[in-house]
A protein has these predicted regions:
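Pepsin/retropepsin-fold aspartyl endopeptidases
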Residues: 1-121
Length: 121
């Protein structure tokens, strides 16, 4: 089970990134059910972390436009397991998408400091 919080009416989950030759980094991500990828991080954070590049891919944005965005790989701790994910370098805040939510039930108490739970199906 993964436990998060609700703040400013947004579900949030902390994601631990495991990067070679660095200490683990914890990043708070907004759970975005409209984002079908795994993780999206602002380009400045991706650069700071020094993630290995994976090229570019097309992304459909919230305004229905399309953009070619750089992608990177990262290992994260997800429900106590190390998992390799694709990170899209885009946007202004870290997002966790539905590809990581597959196989989980999402429930949230939508009030300030409410609890968000991701439980395996």
């Amino acid at each position: 089970m993964i436990v998060g919080t609700v703040a400013d009416l947004q579900g949030r989950v902390e994601v631990v990134l495991r990067i070679a030759d660095q200490d683990d980094r914890t990043i708070e991500c907004v759970v975005d059910t409209g984002f079908q990828g795994e993780l999206a991080l602002p380009p400045a954070i991706v650069a700071l972390l020094g993630l290995p590049t994976g090229g570019r891919m097309w992304a459909k944005l919230a305004d229905d436009s399309h953009a070619s965005v750089p992608v990177f790989s990262a290992d994260i701790l997800w429900d106590d397991q190390e998992v390799r994910v694709t990170v899209m370098a885009m946007g202004s805040r870290p997002l966790l998408g539905t590809e990581l939510l597959q196989g989980f039930n999402l429930s949230a108490d939508f009030e300030e400091d409410g609890q968000l739970l991701l439980t395996p199906l």
